[in-house]
Amino acid sequence: MSKTTNWVGQNLTLTIEKVAHGGIFVARHDGRVVFVSHVLPGEKVLAQVYEDRGGSFCRAEPIQIIEPSGDRVPQVWKQAGPQGAGGAEFGHIKLARQRELKADVLEEALDRMAGIKLRPVVEAAPGDDEANGLGYRTRLQLHVDEAGTVGPYRERSHEVIKVKDLPLAVEDLRELEMHNKNFQNVKKIELAASSTGQVQWKIDSKLKGDER
């Protein structure tokens, strides 16, 4: 293992091995695990380390896909991806491959936590393929900045992004166009849509003395 104790800012050439929990992927470099987002198993990438607290692992994001996977597609939410809006961690992957990767994560968790040897099957719900992985989320958590802008956080930050749409949400939530509204003295807005089209709201107000 390298004597380097902090790799932040370093560019590493990596071959991605497998998926991990949370929509990130695993590579190894110089005896350490490197967790990388927005990649695919089998890809060769150039990635920059952005977090290293010492120990056996660090975290990086891709800056160049040297050898892309055949399962890579353009990000379905154009404002997501590296340094973009969080929440579309698999948006760059073909739907069939997404399901395989989710089954991989579940299989590993069952084995590790319960000792169960089982290969799960993740199947498409009716209409999923036609929707291209969009319009499925029945819950949204949006944040509000000091100017009243409503939107998701930028990946790995508490910066609210002004987005043009919320394409992962079901139509009952999208049509509210929360991202086009302005809220004062509000920290967070949570929305949930039922199967009958009803929408529940929860608004967290910003109280005096709250430093967020």
Model-predicted segments: where are they?
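Accessory RNA-recognition modules of RNA-modification enzymes
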Residues: 1-212
